Amino acid sequence: MNHFVICINNDSNPASLILGKVYRRLPDPEAEAHNMLRVIDEDKSEPNGYLYPASMFAPIELPKVAVQALIGSR
């Protein structure tokens, strides 16, 4: 599973999403079945993330060092 996405459209929520920024994607099979993604956005008040249309993001692969910097080593 790809754990990171990049915002490619923030028209519907510019306060919570920054165009071109990398966001952590959380697993949510039910949301994905409806073409939605659960994402930790700029608000960060909801630790379980918010749902956004998948069309607002593009999946990306990051090097291990970048993943560790974003979520910590596990």
Provide a role label for each language-model segment.
Residues 45-74:
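Intrinsically disordered, low-complexity, charged/polar segments
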Residues 2-56:
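Basic/aromatic-rich interaction segments and small domains that mediate binding to polyanionic partners
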